[in-house]
Amino acid sequence: MDSDKIVFKVHNQLVSVKPEVITDQYEYKYPAIGNQKKPSITLGKAPDLNKAYKSILSGMNAAKLDPDDVCSYLAAAMELFEGVCPDDWASYGILIAKKGDKITPTTLVDIIRTDVEGNWAQTGGQDLTRDPTTAEHASLVGLLLCLYRLSKIVGQNTGNYKTNVADRMEQIFETAPFVKVVEHHTLMTTHKMCANWSTIPNFRFLAGTYDMFFSRIEHLYSAIRVGTVVTAYEDCSGLVSFTGFIKQINLTAREAILYFFHKNFEEEIKRMFEPGQETAVPHSYFIHFRSLGLSGKSPYSSNAVGHVFNLIHFVGCYMGQIRSLNATVISSCAPHEMSVLGGYLGEEFFGKGTFERRFFRDEKELQDYELAEATKTDLALADDGTVNSDDEDFFSGETRSPEAVYTRIMMNGGRLKKSHIRRYVSVSSNHQARPNSFAEFLNKTYSGDQR
């Protein structure tokens, strides 16, 4: 008998079918570079840098920027930011630079130029007659790259948040070593003219390149990174959340995963830790894989590892973390089951730190302490472990073990305890819940279930 088939009757006729569902039609692409070639883009003909500066500044003042010209200028301006490589720099087998080499952002990537001329129109404001200084170039580059960060701020941020961010970034590029090149609020006005800079592949690529360079190279103009920092680990919220989670509960990745009691974690954990990726390598191309075009569909995003993401943020909610309460629930990834597991794990790791003495007045005090601790361990091993079951949580050294937590969940029928529900309701009801957030989910799901 075929175990994949089901049998039933239609009009007294026996029917046998094999149920099949649509599979994910988009394959996740891992960012590892196999061809030993640096990430690359193609742009128009390289402009005269000073002419390009005047055109772009004019366009910014008139809120009429040409994205192709902006990208061409940003790529050309990279030559102004020379720094010294502090160590041999390699990623995915590609030697980027050797220790002591003088490099610019263009060293990291391959920018191919065609013979197509840019527009370089003077669209507004007074023409600049003199050639700009390096500081003026740096200020304009910084302001242009700020458009990337502004376009990444989503609509759910209310009030004047985006305007305030724009104003603060503008102030950076009015202060030494930068110089003021535009009037106040020009950045926000320019952003409103085109709010989708982060969706322009070449602009995103250049923002990621600048960020990768300034994150490693000490430079006078490193503050340019204020606009590009959001390209680091972009579309990587699942992996980033997991990293923050293990630091928070003070476990290794291996130890934390032992608590993931659900079959749907299997594929996601396999996906997150695919061999051959440089997830833990500092200054790797991996960090900017999305902006550098190395992955079309990230295997590390919250949607790619939705069960892991949901669990982590339910634990975060239990601990009262604002970031988790505000995060968006991945509704297709068993949020009810994840909230149950999150309640038990939150209880285990919330307010129950691992405390021990680590610092001593002198070596003798350290030796005395270690001897006393060894004696305690010997006594514990000699104990037959027979304690009243009601007091087990207070006496057992294994209360936090994955086995013990799993047993407690099973003994409670896979349901939350009253104390879990009270905690969830407490943290979510006192929070201004955003639509589809974890706070809203907990409020709607458990506020009427305080048994």
UniProtKB/Swiss-Prot annotation:
Residues bearing PTM Phosphoserine: 389
InterPro entries reported in the protein's UniProt record: Rhabdo_ncapsid, Rhabdovirus_ncapsid_C, Rhabdovirus_ncapsid_N, Rhabdovirus_nucleoprotein-like
Source organism superkingdom: Viruses
Keywords for this protein: Capsid protein, Helical capsid protein, Host cytoplasm, Phosphoprotein, Ribonucleoprotein, RNA-binding, Superantigen, Viral nucleoprotein, Virion
Keyword Ribonucleoprotein: yes
Function: Encapsidates the genome in a ratio of one protein N per nine ribonucleotides, protecting it from nucleases. If expressed without protein P it binds non-specifically RNA and therefore can bind it's own mRNA. Interaction with protein P abolishes any non-specific RNA binding, and prevents phosphorylation. The soluble N-P complex encapsidates specifically the genomic RNA, with protein N protecting the genome like a pearl necklace. The encapsidated genomic RNA is termed the nucleocapsid (NC) and serves as template for viral transcription and replication.
Other facts: Displays a superantigen activity in human and mouse, activating mostly V-beta-8 subtypes of T-cell receptor.
Family named by the database record: Belongs to the lyssavirus nucleocapsid protein family.
The name this protein goes by in its record: Nucleoprotein
